[in-house]
Amino acid sequence: MENFKHLPEPFRIRVIEPVRRTTRSYREEAILKAGMNPFLLDSEDVFIDLLTDSGTGAVTQEMQAAMLRGDEAYSGSRSYHALANAVKEIFGYEYTIPTHQGRGAEQIYIPVLIKKREQEKGLDRSKMVVFSNYFFDTTQGHSQINGATVRNVYTKEAFDTSVNADFKGDFDLEKLEQGIQEVGAENVPYIVCTITCNSAGGQPVSLANMRAMYEIAKKYDIPVVMDSARFAENAYFIQQREPGYKEWTIEQITYESYKYADALAMSAKKDAMVPMGGLLCFKDKSMEDVYNECRTLCVVQEGFPTYGGLEGGAMERLAVGLRDGMRQDWLAYRINQIEYLVNGLEAIGVVCQQPGGHAAFVDAGKLLPHIPADQFPAQALACELYKVAGIRAVEIGSFLLGRDPKTGKQLPCPAELLRLTIPRATYTQTHMDFIIEAFKQVKENAENIKGLTFTYEPKVLRHFTARLKEV
């Protein structure tokens, strides 16, 4: 099949979920009732749901079959050992704690690493700073509620939608080391490497950059946590783009990548393809004390450490999903689907971030230049897209980034993006064509789209539950 321009989806669809069509007037009323926040829409009112790829896609028949092997023992479950063995085989990590999802892992490891730095290095909580190539929203939120200032150290081209680069998710290594020296290494309890870098547009991090980042971290004795939601997509980009890895398998690249971290926190609802599940894992005995502390917190916050909020069948399914998500043909199809959508949008004059993994990212700032950042152009675009076509998407910009917890001022955002997140094995090329057609209509009316202001604003992670109105 090497000579075909477009290959169909590499799977057969056996089970379907009917969706209903609605009228424009119905959708206008629905988004108004939802406070101009697509998160607050009912799913039955959504025709194409591009809010997230987290737990919203299809599962493989092997994953579904694995559910039947579930051992529901409260402690020492056979299914836990199946999962822990998969982690050791894929990532090379010795210690595994299952969690209900990624934020379950974050609420455990973040306070433990802060406490450890305080006890061993004399961390001053009033000066505490944590670094990342870009923090995912919940990782940022958990860091902030534990008193840390978050600092994203990304490359200058990361958010420039006019520039293409192979690894726009990379750390700016110079800024990272300068930042550590500025605040004092003792005041940096951890560094988070986010793969792929969601907020920059699903952009990958190169192995060379991971290796150099890890060398800096070890120089200052700072633990590195790999935020691993899209580990397989990142490995695919390394294989396709980074010199020297073309002949490596996805499994080999993944194993190599995790040499450059001390722990991993994962929402398994993305590349591991499960509807619910997460992981918190530690590399070796150098992190055994942290692992033991996290096990204790897991009992209080998630469940016994050998189930962590997951039933036995779910752990079996996750063990299979970790492997299924690394299939070469699957990843090629998935990334090509994103490229098809981005190329189609660019062809009608809708500027997008360079195609990355899991989503197309529309540059709302360029499509709606009349709306200032503090009136959330990408959120306004999301509402208009829903009105036009019943498509639910998510803002990745000033609305999501939020305010400085110390000053209360809006944090400056490097780009105002609308994320069109593609659930796995759920939508076909026909759906992509429909999305492109919807944007044609949105673009024709772009100058009439209004900015938004708050009617209700939560203090933390406001984008999930805030309510807004048109200015």
Curated annotation (Swiss-Prot):
- Give the modified residues of type N6-(pyridoxal phosphate)lysine: 270
Coiled-coil residues: none
Spell out the subunit comment: Homotetramer.
- What pathway or pathways are given for this protein in its record? Amino-acid degradation; L-tryptophan degradation via pyruvate pathway; indole and pyruvate from L-tryptophan: step 1/1
Domain of life the protein comes from: Bacteria
HAMAP family from the entry?
Answer: Tryptophanase (MF_00544)
Q: Quote the gene name from the UniProt entry.
A: tnaA
By its UniProt entry, which InterPro entries does this protein fall under? ArAA_b-elim_lyase/Thr_aldolase, Beta-eliminating_lyase, PyrdxlP-dep_Trfase, PyrdxlP-dep_Trfase_major, PyrdxlP-dep_Trfase_small, TNase, Tryptophanase_CS
Enzyme Commission number(s) from the entry: 4.1.99.1
**Known catalysed reaction(s)?**
L-tryptophan + H2O = indole + pyruvate + NH4(+)
SUPFAM superfamilies from the entry? PLP-dependent transferases (SSF53383)
Record keyword Metal-binding present: no
Q: Which keywords does UniProt give here?
A: Lyase, Pyridoxal phosphate, Tryptophan catabolism
Names of required cofactors:
pyridoxal 5'-phosphate
Family according to the record: Belongs to the beta-eliminating lyase family.
Question: Mind telling me what this protein is named?
Answer: Tryptophanase
